[in-house]
Amino acid sequence: EDNTSLSLRAESGTNEDNFDFAQSDKEDNTSLSLRAESRTNENQFMFLFIGTLSKGKQPLYVIQLVEELYKRGKNVILELYGEGSLRKELEHYISQNNLEAIVFLKGNQNKETVLKGYQNSHFLILPSKSEGWPKVVAEAMFWGCVPIASPVSCVSYMMGNGSRGVILREELNQDVDQIEAVISKQEVYQKMASEGQTWSRQFTTDKFEAEISKLLNG
């Protein structure tokens, strides 16, 4: 993919493809860090999924990760933003497993709601089977929301090979162990959130496009 196609996608209006750090927000790194710190002091952990409810995005695996954390006694909430062909299947799974109190299918959301989702969540989960330009990973890091993602495309690079987020192995118990290790230690979560903010804020949209294009094109 070249910079032209990346730019065209960046200009599209969908939540998935529109790269927008909402840099008009006047919060600086200090206030972002303080907010990330305050989130770790809460007893409840907020998880976010943003994407189509399709097999390629694996939203069922997202639900199962949070479900297993819940079974292990963690106070967790998951919100999924997006629509897709798997919605009925996910609704059935949530109902059959009595997860209505912790898992919420929110449908498509506007930019303002997505922004608030990043700001209020501890983690973004993205277990995609493929990802051309993982905009949501960088946006999550920008707002101090730690990504949990599959190592596709340039995701491992973006996440510092695990220093700025949790890299999924797509084996449920192993992945839940990884997440549990982060949420059990406040300093580990804060370090990941802080490093993600520092890394993502190096980039303007143009610079980010150029860097990702270089990675994708080798």
Give the role of each language-model region.
Residues 91-109:
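Nucleotide-activated donor-binding/catalytic signature segment of Leloir-type glycosyltransferases, i.e.
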Residues 129:
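Aromatic "clamp/platform" in nucleotide-sugar-dependent glycosyltransferases that forms part
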Residues 146-149:
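Short hydrophobic beta-strand element within catalytic cores of glycosyltransferases
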Residues 161-173, 181-186:
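Conserved acidic donor-binding segment of nucleotide-sugar-dependent glycosyltransferases
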